[in-house]
Amino acid sequence: MDKCNAKCKMPNAKSLMKIRFLKIKGTWREVADAARTTIRRDEGEGEPSTKWKKRILLAEHSPIRKLCFNWKWEDLPYWVSVHFVRHKYGIEHFVSTQRSDRTGEDRTAKTQDAPVVHECFANAQAVMFISRRRLCSQASPETRAAWKAVVEAIAEKEPEVAACCVPECVYRGFCPEFKSCGFVDTPAFKEAVAKYRTV
């Protein structure tokens, strides 16, 4: 188990959410070899370059799904957990039960912000896709804070993946939301887009 723990005080939350980054499954060599298979080449050797990693992540070719991440939120407000379980492609969720017959506590007495343990296992493409929704300023501040903690943990192990975790506007180059937060009209937006696209 990788030791990569972080605590985060969530906006308007009663408890201190904690994240544990458990492990990475798959290697960049495996990603590269899968890519080589698609062009009828034998397996290669060594670690792919940072530039190659960024390029295949931006292209979102299928081999990147061989790289997977496992993490766990602790004391995550239940309603924030519900936001995350809406994501279903390339990710699995394991959420602690609130059933009365399992916990010995009255489920009907629990509030929406009751803390839960929420573990996830997701591939690189799913992590990038979820980032587009959950790093957006239209996402709730609490959900955004929880997802930022995931991206920051990934950045310590796989910085190229974290560099491709951006909000929808940076990914598309414009804001598709009905009500924009205004970020697209700032110099910081142009800088973020340029940084995202740089290989």
Regions found by a protein language model. Name each.
Residues 1-199:
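Family-specific signature for flavin-dependent thymidylate synthase
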